[in-house]
């Protein structure tokens, strides 16, 4: 995806940034692959919903789908997920891997926000509607995927559980929408933060805000800042890297 951005972006500086992001993402894949192999054996396959969304973003030649879909939404969710893992894990190696990965990801997410700030106001009404509608659809798909038991089929099977039994029990016991609304009341909820990002970028408008208002108070969001989840961890990683680089400088 990062490599494909080089082909659809027109600004030379943006092309150079996308090329650099490609290198960083390759580093992340290598790091996490080696970590998972060393600690757990092999990774689980990507779930069907997320896999479908990623395939749609990668295969599209439409710039806004790549920027909004990956740089703002997927990268934003990754920052939140990495931040929760960093907080919960007792493994110092994983903490370090997550911290430095998040230092890269924060810039990837910010690139998307800069693009939106500069581009969305210049779109025609028809173009803006396309961006708004597609973003709302992907947001809702990702949001429901958070509490989607079908996504965890491989996990259930790995511990000897019949995924059909677990899914049926889950659907009988949980009110999905209520669970989502309750979780999105937390100020650091990754989807709440993502919603703020889209709102501040004027991708959520009066026309589409009902999709999001079903789960979160939009007036509250408008009064809050839109710092990406986990930015404090990313900044800590950057500070560490600066100290390392300073120590390597030769007079």
Label the model's feature ranges.
Residues 48-72, 88-89, 135-153:
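Acidic/His metal-coordination segments adjacent to aromatic residues that form catalytic metal sites
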Residues 2-59:
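Long, hydrophobic, well-ordered secondary-structure blocks that form the structural core
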Residues 126-251:
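Extended, helix-rich structural scaffolds rather than catalytic motifs
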Residues 21-36, 68-82, 101-112, 116:
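Alpha-helical transition-metal enzyme core signature, strongest for iron centers
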Residues 8, 23-24, 104, 136-138:
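A short structural micro-motif
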Residues 81, 111-119, 133-140, 144-145:
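An internal, amphipathic alpha-helical element
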Residues 5-16, 39-40, 82-100, 114-130, ...:
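Inter-helical turn/loop segments and adjacent helix faces that build the functional surface
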